[in-house]
Amino acid sequence: MDEWSQKRDTMQHYNVVAKSYDELYANEQEAKIETALKKVGIPNNSLILDSGCGTGLLFEYVADKAKIVMGLDISRGLLEEAKKRAKSFGNVHLVLADADYTPFKDGVFSHVFAVTLLQNMPNPEKTLAELIRVAGKNAFLIVTGLKKRFSLDFLEGLLRKLKLNVIEIVDGDPLLKCYVAVCVKV
């Protein structure tokens, strides 16, 4: 299947499940977010990108601390749900876009989150390279990798290949179906 066909299928799937997404996946997503945030602080001047933001579950954890939170997703249905959550915050903005081709300048964000994104992308290396491009110097990148899709060695190798400083990859939590990698762009 070509790259765009895979992305289109993913987009259509999430458009269909958007209204029930939180009911189906919120507990699992929140466990990933909470694991990541135990490792990374969010200073008041933070500029955060939540790439593949889904329904915006991350917003409730970071928006009250950050200067700006940008939620990006390819699914209009998920963004409609995220919009409801974003209304509670004056600093959350949403963008309908492909995570491989974000509309942001180089080096903008202090924190880039990619929770449950890579397993949905046809070329995870390309996606990560784009996330690194928009991350500022010394920015944190928090990336999850579904264990059914990626081995720990593959994920760590990919992060290191792209010259990220891997601080930690959380693997041992039985509640998580994924690895949670905390990295810094150097």
Indicate residue ranges for each PLM-predicted region:
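Short alpha-helix
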Residues: 149-162, 179
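Class I SAM-dependent methyltransferase SAM/SAH-binding core
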Residues: 49, 55-101
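A short SAM/SAH-binding and catalytic strip from SAM-dependent methyltransferases
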Residues: 111-123
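Conserved beta-strand signature within the Rossmann-like core of class I S-adenosyl-L-methionine
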Residues: 138-146
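Conserved class I S-adenosyl-L-methionine
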Residues: 1-42, 57, 149, 177-180
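A short acidic, Gly/Pro-enriched loop at the edge of an enzyme's catalytic core
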Residues: 100-112
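Core SAM-dependent methyltransferase catalytic element
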Residues: 171-186
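A short glycine-rich, Lys/Arg-flanked "PGG" loop and its adjoining helix->strand segment in the class I
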Residues: 125-137
